[in-house]
Amino acid sequence: MYRWLVGNLRLWSVQELVSSELFDNHKSIHGEAVTTNRESVAIHLSIYLLVYVLAAGTMDYKNAGVDIEAGYKSVELMKKHIAKTMRPEVLGGIGGFSGAFSMSAFKNMEEPTLVSGTDGCGTKVKLAMIMDKHDTIGIDAVAMCVNDIACAGAEPLFFLDYIACGKNYPEKIAEIVSGVAEGCVQSGAALIGGETAEHPGLMPEDEHDLAGFAVGVIDKQDLLTGEELNPGDVLIGMASTGVHSNGFSLVRKVFEMTRESLDTYYDELGTTLGEALIAPTRIYVKALKSIRDAGVRIHARSHITGGGFYENIPRMLKEGTHAVVERDSYPVLPIFKLLAKKGNIEEKMMYNTFNMGLGMVLAVAPEDVDKTMEAIRKEGDTPYVVGRIEAGEKGVTLC
């Protein structure tokens, strides 16, 4: 132990202190300046530092910046939230090295196929930190993952979260997990595991980041690949709650530039700017299940996230098909009009960055439009007929 300390202190002294102006000269007891061996002085200082460390007592993990007790408290506080998400297929409880989920309930499927997705909330986490509001950002993390796997037709089974933080504040961590649990309840996924990683020195104490991982199941024969898409199919858009979880770097830049306060109330928003921006991402899982239960076969689905319409709608298309979206077929939400106005953002850039009021776009056969719209409304969501599929080069046209 002594050798390790001396070696490390000596290394630090030589590298950090030997070049310091402090050791260019030092005075003898008679007051005259004498040139010294800089490395020798540094080594002597190392010994003094060693004595100081030994006198101060032994080091532990908490002194290094990681509070294990805070971690235990976080787990205790989040247990009640996690319990709300449990499904019969979950095996075991909280605290193990892994989460287990039985697949025996899916024996009726010819070929059960797992579908996975991982995502985060982007820089929307920064907004939550600024507003000191942490109970909804977890919904965003779940939504970003389960909406993605729902585009393949999968039913979400379970979810895992990862929280990185500069310092573990148990109440804040539990608040974040309460949002994750709420997102799991909305999507039907069980929260079977997670990690809270305390990163002293890597992240500021008051900052954190959040990511998630979702796994779902579908019978392989029902997997959505876009191959069933046909010219003549109708595009149905499902309303978003607002900005959702993409484009927040641009959002922050706009309102930093205009020096807008998040507490500013806007009549057109019906709330403050901050509350409009932090509105959690809508989870479409139950509405999509309702459509399936109505006997409708969706031909393709697109989750409108980063990249807006221009990047995401083509992802659901097969070669030889082209999507046409009519911009006046649904109302653009006021938050996007405000963003465009305040930031002087061109319309094409808006549609290439944000969801513009539609968080999910579906393609169905013309004869299934009415049943699809009814099933969506049944779950409290708002649908719009927004366009069509034509024959042509793979891509999207907004008209």
What are the functions of these language-model segments?
Residues W4, W12-V14, N25, H30-E32, ...:
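Short Gly/Ser/Thr- and charged-rich N-terminal loops/segments
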Residues L9, V18-S20, A33-T35, S40-V41:
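Short, low-complexity intrinsically disordered segments enriched in A/P/G/S/L with frequent Arg
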Residues R10, L77-T241:
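Glycine-rich phosphate/pyrophosphate-binding loop regions near the starts of catalytic domains
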Residues S13, S19-S20, S28, S40, ...:
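Serine residues within intrinsically disordered or low-complexity segments
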Residues G57-G65, K172-S187, M203-L210, L262, ...:
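Glycine-/charge-enriched secondary-structure boundary and capping motifs
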Residues G57-P88:
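N-terminal amphipathic/basic leader segments beginning at the initiator methionine
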Residues P231-T271, E275:
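Acidic, glycine-rich loop-and-beta core segments that form the ion-binding/anion-interacting portion
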